[in-house]
């Protein structure tokens, strides 16, 4: 069995939306479970109907039939035969075979222990054994199901283990799942055939991730032999957990996430290098043929071969101080690649100098005496929280803030306290949502962990924003960088509302990773991250300015009795109680709601910004033809600052929107540009027309305590607004809004849609959040361009 990289990627996208835990679902395969009827008599295989029902229950969505069929076929196939190899590859295979023979003596001892007295034909055979997850007859032979039908079936073990790789769980729990799944006889031990299944699973992971597997198989086999600590030929559960948690390659190859457990311990990830790089342990070059070439620490870039990881020095950075100290010294490591010397500016050859993890400077061995021992943190000193300013909370320190009034969570960050640097630095708290922007979030997380102190960088999908906010709450001067979409920003701001900041609420900058990124656009951070250099983004944060942004409280009260409501008008739960960007009812929310439903059902079709925009265009076209929200004024009443708004005046509306920022739908300005105010003769125009003219001159400001109300005529008008040729109809600018709906309407808050039954909506001002605005880009005048052109021509 082997999934293609595309199938594995599609499964990963669905897993991001799953709410179930695989470990909890294993009980459903027991005799009283809902999936038991789909199993074969021996409980080892499952039919296509059970496979489909299990996937729907696990992912919480109907997977496309083509994907289900492809997955079922992949799991039912035996291992794919290798392609015809070249002479060079044949030579390598010969070397691997000889190396395998040297290990055959130790591997022969891995068979079933005396108690059971049963062995499979495969374990007794002297022929080379195929690396499959279960015995070959279980995969290829026909199964007699509970209903005595002859139908295609797939082995259950590879399915469970493959899905376990997609879950965000602790290594301990994942190791438990793998052990119990492959312990087919349930005796608490892994015999040779069961270990072969685990090895094949690890090789599959290597193929999914397109790693270099030339020498990987022998490394894995040697590793599995070493886990058998008592050399009795079988691996117990205790040996499995002990070996799994202490052998980093095993965790990586099983697809498990490695966490930063103790200071000084490396956090490994497999990596491919674009330039010649050498192993820090054996000092030989890392060689690979297009695949991953070695294990590299995400925190300090210490790099080794897979086979050398056990001999790697435990010399990673210390992210906090276990005792009171004020000076930070360089953290030197041997230069395993070429770089420039910070002193003499000459090239530092491989292992001819050292590099500091904190200031990222390299220096020759001969130049080290001329360099100060104390580290100044280099070019990023403004953003780094030094480890000397993070220490255990129980340590008393004169410069620290009292902890008596702080309620710490159970997270490890609650055991640490941070103090502000004495200089003018503003340490940066980085909160990353790895689910935003495809794979961009994961890469940004790893890069920031290396550029800054890893204690400053948090994965929101694992910890949420609270641990990082709690650690930084005691700092006098700090900034926050949210890497994600508009929903991620709202999540962080709402978490900040629940906390106390003794020195004032820190300002927030945005690195846009979402689809619309409207808040990032109006704060000049751009419409999306385009792989810019993170050093430049940190420079922009350092030069940014402060602004206050209004935030609005929304309360929704259902007016109709739930029992009297029709089944077709069943509503959803509102996603937020606070408006940061906008709130809308009608045509635009209808398109967004249909987009949201489609994305949850087929997430693999929404994996890029361009494809998302095309889907919006298609759904907008269908909404134009259907006009599902026409005659909106007949079903909605609105009061702005106590005055009723006539929605039926002039053209009929199909939607309304309340705007807090001047960007919506990925950069559209619904309020539009304001006209210049002109004087008029008193009494020349009626009062209503005068108020309408005055409304056209009002300017939108995100910090004026006012929210703007506009009307949308149709989906076609939304396209015209997006093109910049037209604006929405201005209705009001006010500080309080009350809306009553008389039927179910699609609604959305900050891009998160839902279907809302008849209700009364109250919107009031909540507070203001401090945000960072990027500096306006410099405009090059035509004179400067002409001058530069003439200068170049002269040269």
From Swiss-Prot:
Subunit record text: Monomer.
One GO cellular component, as annotated: plasma membrane
A Pfam family that the UniProt record links to this protein: DAGK_cat
Residues annotated as domain DAGKc: 423-558
Family annotation (SUPFAM superfamilies): Cysteine-rich domain, EF-hand, NAD kinase/diacylglycerol kinase-like
An MF annotation (GO) of this entry: ATP-dependent diacylglycerol kinase activity
EC id: 2.7.1.107
Keyword Cell division: no
Annotated Ca(2+) 1 binding sites: 183, 185, 187, 194
Gene Ontology biological-process entries: diacylglycerol metabolic process; intracellular signal transduction; olfactory behavior; phosphatidic acid biosynthetic process; phospholipase C-activating G protein-coupled receptor signaling pathway; regulation of long-term neuronal synaptic plasticity; thermotaxis
Protein known as: Probable diacylglycerol kinase 3
Free-text function comment from the UniProt entry: Involved in AFD-neuron mediated thermotaxis. Regulates behavior to environmental temperature. Thought to have a role in olfactory adaptation by affecting diacylglycerol levels.
Zinc finger (Phorbol-ester/DAG-type): 265-316, 329-375
Domain of life: Eukaryota
Residues that bind Ca(2+) 2: 228, 230, 232, 239
Reactions accelerated catalytically: a 1,2-diacyl-sn-glycerol + ATP = a 1,2-diacyl-sn-glycero-3-phosphate + ADP + H(+)
Family: Belongs to the eukaryotic diacylglycerol kinase family.
UniProt domain EF-hand: residue ranges: 170-205, 215-250
Annotated source species: Caenorhabditis elegans
PANTHER family: DIACYLGLYCEROL KINASE, DIACYLGLYCEROL KINASE 1
Name of the coding gene: dgk-3
Disruption phenotype: Slow to adapt to new temperature levels. Dgk-3 and dgk-1 double mutant shows defects in olfactory adaptation.
Keyword entries, A-Z: ATP-binding, Calcium, Kinase, Metal-binding, Nucleotide-binding, Repeat, Transferase, Zinc, Zinc-finger
